[in-house]
């Protein structure tokens, strides 16, 4: 489903724990990391698409998370020219995304990236709140920065967030030169990737 401007409607998912860390996922068979995300199907609301993608990509169900916040506006990024499919009609030039901030309320052992036959990810880890903004692929960086800034304004403002989940000192920006933290790795089950993202 592509809109009139050539953007594909999409949802982005940020899952946090009580330490103020966020789930960072490794793309299947690649050394590339990102937040879970996926397209919105015809007839779906953004929230319905989010819960579907949450199960397909991370193996979590609605009962396993608490929805803390959803971005107010659509956030857009354009695909690099090398990723454009000029023979597709209509042509998709990028994604427009609604972002959701979720709190994990179950044990992390429930995270299972092999719920489907063609998983998007083969590993994950917890990282500091701002770490993904610096580490994501460059063409998604501005959208990540805007989404995380909006989430931070909610999480760390006691007048907007009555849960008082995190403290500022738990979300300092990660330095780019630091060693990558340990991640949960899944053994490959097949060689097929899922839909183009």
From Swiss-Prot:
GO cellular component, one term: cytoplasm
Region (Disordered): 170-197
Principal EC category: hydrolase
UniProt motif (Nudix box) ranges: 38-59
This protein's record includes keyword Lipoprotein: no
Necessary cofactors: a divalent metal cation
Key word Glycosyltransferase present: no
Alphabetical keyword list: Hydrolase
Its EC number(s): 3.6.1.-
InterPro entries the record matches: Nudix_hydrolase, NUDIX_hydrolase-like_dom_sf, NUDIX_hydrolase_CS, NUDIX_hydrolase_dom, RppH
GO terms for biological process, alphabetical: mRNA catabolic process
GO molecular function: mRNA 5'-diphosphatase activity
Nudix hydrolase domain span: 6-149
Function (record text): Accelerates the degradation of transcripts by removing pyrophosphate from the 5'-end of triphosphorylated RNA, leading to a more labile monophosphorylated state that can stimulate subsequent ribonuclease cleavage.
Sequence similarity: Belongs to the Nudix hydrolase family. RppH subfamily.
PANTHER family: M7GPPPN-MRNA HYDROLASE (PTHR23114:SF17)
Matching HAMAP family: Nudix_RppH
Protein name listed in UniProt: RNA pyrophosphohydrolase
Species this protein is from: Actinobacillus succinogenes (strain ATCC 55618 / DSM 22257 / CCUG 43843 / 130Z)
Upper lineage: Bacteria, Pseudomonadati, Pseudomonadota, Gammaproteobacteria, Pasteurellales
């Amino acid at each position: 489903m592509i809109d009139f401007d050539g953007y594909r409607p999409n949802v982005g998912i940020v899952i946090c724990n009580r330490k103020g860390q966020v789930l960072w996922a490794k793309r299947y068979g690649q050394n590339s990391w990102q937040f879970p995300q996926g397209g919105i199907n015809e007839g779906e609301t953004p929230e319905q698409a989010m819960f579907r993608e949450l199960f397909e990509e991370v193996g979590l169900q609605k009962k396993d998370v608490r929805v803390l916040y959803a971005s107010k506006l659509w956030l857009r990024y354009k695909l690099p020219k090398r990723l454009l499919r000029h023979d597709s009609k209509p042509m998709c030039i990028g994604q427009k995304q609604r972002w959701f901030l979720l709190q994990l309320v179950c044990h992390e052992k429930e995270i299972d990236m092999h719920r489907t036959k063609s998983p998007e990810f083969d590993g994950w880890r917890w990282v500091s709140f701002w770490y993904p903004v610096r580490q994501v692929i460059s063409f998604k960086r501005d959208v990540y920065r805007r989404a995380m800034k909006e989430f931070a304004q909610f999480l760390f403002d006691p007048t907007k967030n009555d849960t008082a989940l995190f403290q500022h000192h738990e979300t300092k920006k990660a330095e780019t030169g630091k060693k990558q933290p340990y991640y949960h790795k899944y053994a490959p089950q097949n060689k097929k990737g899922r839909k183009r993202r």
